[in-house]
Structures are given as structure tokens and as C-alpha cells.
From Swiss-Prot:
Compositionally biased spans, kind Polar residues: 132-142
Bias type Low complexity, positions: 120-131
This protein's name: Sec-independent protein translocase protein TatB
Region Disordered: start-end pairs: 120-151
Keyword Kinase (UniProt): no
Keywords attached to this entry: Cell inner membrane, Cell membrane, Membrane, Protein transport, Translocation, Transmembrane, Transmembrane helix, Transport
Taxonomic superkingdom: Bacteria
Assembly, per entry: The Tat system comprises two distinct complexes: a TatABC complex, containing multiple copies of TatA, TatB and TatC subunits, and a separate TatA complex, containing only TatA subunits. Substrates initially bind to the TatABC complex, which probably triggers association of the separate TatA complex to form the active translocon.
Compartment annotation: Cell inner membrane
Classification via NCBIfam families: tatB (TIGR01410)
Lineage, top ranks: Bacteria, Pseudomonadati, Campylobacterota, Epsilonproteobacteria, Campylobacterales
Gene Ontology CC annotations of this record: TAT protein transport complex
């Protein structure tokens, strides 16, 4: 039990009989047996408590890993949703860009077909086209030199 051989146990029993006497020896043996039983129960209880704590620590580690996995999965789903939203926005912007480019192409076609027709149809240009150019003023001052119209 404790690494003792048979001769050592006999020596301890003889010493116990000498010190305790035959009257008290049975009571002492019962008390020693109860002590070892209690000691064994305490050791087993401590062992089971330690094992439970180790299991709890392992469960905590597992829970932490699962939490990290769930967090990573949630962030990847958020990124995926964000990328999907960006793709949707990109397609909307490209559609708008295409419609603007088509409008620009139509305007360019109209301009290149007959620019004079567009100028004649423009109400702002109608006033300027119908007006006669004004005569230049007789006195022009160019680079501090006076040019006077000679009559």
C-alpha cells in the first residue's frame, strides 16, 4: 500500500501491540482504518473536483473557440452582405452611367448632323443671329496708340 513489505508491517504490528497493549489495539486499528478511509475519500473528492475544474476549463476553451468561430462566420456574412450591397450599388451606378453616356451620344449625333439647324432652333441664338453686327467705334485705343477714323 505505501511501498512496505511484509517484514516491515510485522515490525509495526509488534510495536503497536507493545505500546497500546492487547486491550486498546482493536480500537486503534478501527480508528486507523477510519482515518485511511476518510483520507481516501478526501483524496478522491479532491481528484474529482480537480477533474471537474479541468472539464470546466476545457468547456470554457471550447466555448471560446465556438464563439470565435461564430464571430468569424458573422463577420464574413456581414462582409458578404456588404459586398453584395456594393455590387448592387455598382450595377445601379453603371446603369446610370450607361444612360448618361447614351444621352451624350445622342446629343453628339444631333450636333454633328446639322449644327446650323440647332443654332437656328435655339431661342437664345435667334436674337443674336437676327441682329446686325454693330459698327466698330471710330476711336479704338490699342496698346496706348490711338487709331482714329479719318473722314
Amino acid at each position: 500500500m505505501f511501498g512496505m513489505s511484509l517484514p516491515e508491517i510485522i515490525i509495526i504490528a509488534v510495536i503497536a501491540v507493545i505500546f497500546l497493549g492487547p486491550d486498546k489495539l482493536p480500537d486503534a486499528m478501527v480508528k486507523i482504518a477510519k482515518f485511511f478511509k476518510l483520507f481516501k475519500q478526501t483524496v478522491n473528492s479532491a481528484k474529482s473536483t480537480f477533474e471537474q475544474e479541468v472539464k470546466i476549463a476545457e468547456l470554457k476553451e471550447d466555448a471560446k473557440k465556438y464563439k470565435e468561430n461564430i464571430t468569424n462566420a458573422a463577420s464574413s456574412v456581414r462582409k458578404k452582405l456588404t459586398f453584395e450591397e456594393l455590387d448592387e450599388l455598382k450595377s445601379t451606378v453603371s446603369g446610370t452611367k450607361n444612360s448618361i453616356n447614351e444621352s451624350l451620344a445622342d446629343i453628339k449625333k444631333e450636333i454633328t448632323k446639322d449644327p446650323l439647324t440647332l443654332l437656328n432652333n435655339d431661342p437664345l441664338n435667334n436674337e443674336t443671329l437676327n441682329e446686325q453686327p454693330s459698327k466698330p467705334s471710330p476711336n479704338l485705343n490699342l496698346e496706348n496708340k490711338e487709331i482714329k477714323k479719318e473722314a
